[in-house]
Each structure stands twice: as C-alpha cells, then as structure tokens.
C-alpha cells in the first residue's frame, strides 16, 4: 500500500466530534487501500462513568475493527503494525494521563517528555497509516494545581511534537473540521 500522507493528528475538545471524524477517516482509508482497520484504545474503565464513555465509543464505532488496548505501552503497540494497517489511536491525552498516574508522586516533565519522545519516534518511523486523536487542552485558563499544570503543559508539548511529525493536522470544533496542516491529501 502506498499513501503519501500516512500520519494524521486530530485535535479537539471534549465531545467535539474528533473521534467520529477520526473513525470516518480510518474507515475511508481502510477501504481505499484494502487495509486492516485497527483501533487502539488508551482508556481504562476505572469508574462507571468512564465505562459508559468507553461503551458509547464502542457502539458508535460499530463492527469491523481489530481492537487493541494500550493504556501505557502505546509506542510498543504501534511498533507492531505494518504497511497494510490503518491504525486509529484514541486518545493521546488519556494515555498521557495514564502515565501521569503511573508515575504518581515521581511524575515529572522529564519522565513524561521521555514517553512522548518515544511515541513520536515510533509514529514517525512506522510504515502504518496512523490516525491519532488528542484533546486540545490549552485553550482555557492556566490550572491552579501543580499536577493539573504538569498535565496541561505536557499535553500541549505532546500535541506540538506529534503535529510536527504528522502529514495532516485537523482541529475539530462543534463537529466541524478546521485543517491546521495539510499535505494536500486527507
């Protein structure tokens, strides 16, 4: 399979329509290239509300996906895909948050940046078509708590790093796509 643009970053706020947009793009690419469509989930159902969110995404997505879970070791999971795969990762900010809690009181910019750098390297080198979904969390006020600032700052840097490595970057607001970076193909 050959596709001149095989890395896409889809950004948006909560319930903005970013997952739906990314799912449609993944299905379209899978059909165009007769490729296997993979969904890599990063969320863990740690409470009832999160379990309901996960269920909502699963039912909205429908059949035909090879599903994988990677709440922490996302780079390792992505390195397993090849040129015949279309891979949708939903969502990077949940993944970053998982690492923040995994590190606990030892969480730091350096540790989170190391995980993001590892992920960005794998995304750049992967032969697979990868569609990444992430929350744009930097449009609000600066959070008051240290852990919240650590998360927001690192999420912003993560999105910048991955946007540099992706061929296309789209911001979804109110269900509408706004192209931020384009290689000419979506």
Predicted regions span which residues?
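Charged, low-complexity C-terminal accessory regions
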Residues: 1-18, 28, 34, 40, ...
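Conserved P-loop
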Residues: 6-81
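Residue-level signal for inorganic ion chemistry
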Residues: 22, 57, 88, 135, ...
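SAM-dependent methyltransferases
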Residues: 1-5, 86-89, 114-119
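Short, basic/glycine-rich phosphate-binding loops at helix/coil junctions
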Residues: 4, 51, 55-58, 90-103, ...
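Helix-adjacent hinge/juxtasegments
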Residues: 63-111
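Generic beta-sheet signal
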Residues: 8-10, 37, 85-91, 128-132
């Amino acid at each position: 399979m050959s596709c001149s643009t095989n890395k896409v970053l889809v950004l948006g706020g909560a319930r903005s329509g970013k997952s739906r947009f990314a799912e449609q793009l993944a299905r379209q690419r899978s059909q165009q290239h007769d490729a296997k469509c993979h969904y890599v989930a990063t969320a863990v159902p740690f409470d009832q509300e999160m379990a309901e969110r996960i269920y909502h995404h699963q039912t909205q997505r429908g059949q035909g996906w090879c599903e994988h879970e990677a709440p922490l070791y996302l780079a390792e999971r992505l390195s397993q895909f090849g040129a015949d795969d279309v891979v949708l990762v939903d969502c990077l900010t949940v993944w970053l948050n998982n690492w923040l809690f995994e590190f606990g009181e030892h969480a730091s910019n350096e540790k989170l940046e190391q995980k993001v750098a590892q992920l960005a390297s794998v995304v750049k080198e992967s032969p697979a078509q990868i569609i990444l979904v992430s929350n744009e969390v930097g449009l609000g006020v600066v959070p008051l708590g240290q852990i919240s600032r650590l998360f927001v700052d690192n999420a912003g840097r993560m999105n910048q790093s991955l946007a540099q490595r992706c061929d296309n970057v789209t911001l979804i607001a109110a269900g509408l796509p706004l192209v931020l970076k384009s290689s000419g193909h979506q």
